[in-house]
């Protein structure tokens, strides 16, 4: 099996979107390929499973109805691997590898890290021959990306932002779909300096 980040989710006909919207999804990592590249293997690695939920007043997930699923419901609570706004450590002159999975049923994520570029090294189609440097990336439901972040700053805390994204019209249901405001989903904090300076492999 090819190496990379994959994911598990239900395949019960007629119930997939509902179960994914309620959080039934998990990452699956197959090792190999890029994992043997020295700078990649030396990077601090985290898997970020992005999900959104709608909760009732007691904090319980609301079971989405057919109308909400057809309308592309976006939950008001966004979690990252089950946490809200987690922090990830990066070393100065080190590398951070974020393995991103959009496990939301409808929400698109348009991600940007303050003060840093991201270097895409793999997609859900496999590893890239040459890393692609971007200032933001878009993840549709089910999409995956592996990115490297170089610890190029002297220190500080930098927010991983989800930027507004217009998914288009809801058709006969009216309205515009997608996030209209930017918000923080996680942050990167500098802790120490790498014993050996790292570079994004080319």
Q: What function would you assign to each model-found segment?
A:
Residues 1-148, 187-202:
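Histidine-centered copper-binding motifs that mark active-site loops
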Residues 14-17, 153-191:
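Terminal connector regions
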């Amino acid at each position: 099996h090819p190496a990379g980040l994959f994911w598990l989710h239900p395949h019960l006909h007629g119930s997939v979107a509902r179960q994914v919207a309620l959080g039934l999804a998990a990452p699956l990592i197959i090792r190999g390929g890029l994992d043997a590249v020295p700078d990649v293997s030396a990077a601090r690695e985290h898997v970020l499973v992005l999900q959104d939920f709608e909760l009732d007043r007691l904090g319980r997930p609301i079971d989405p109805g057919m109308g909400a699923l057809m309308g592309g419901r976006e939950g008001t609570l966004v979690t990252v691997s089950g946490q809200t706004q987690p922090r990830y450590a990066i070393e100065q002159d080190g590398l951070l590898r974020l393995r991103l999975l959009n496990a939301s049923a409808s929400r698109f994520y348009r991600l940007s890290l303050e003060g840093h570029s991201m270097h895409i090294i793999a997609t859900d189609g496999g590893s890239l021959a040459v890393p692609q440097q971007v200032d933001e990336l878009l993840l549709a439901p089910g999409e995956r990306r592996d990115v490297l972040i170089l610890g190029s700053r002297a220190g500080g805390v930098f927010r991983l932002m989800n930027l507004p994204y217009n998914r288009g019209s809801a058709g006969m249901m009216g309205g515009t779909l997608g996030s209209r405001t930017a918000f923080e989903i996680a942050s990167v904090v500098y802790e120490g300096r790498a014993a050996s300076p790292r570079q994004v492999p080319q």
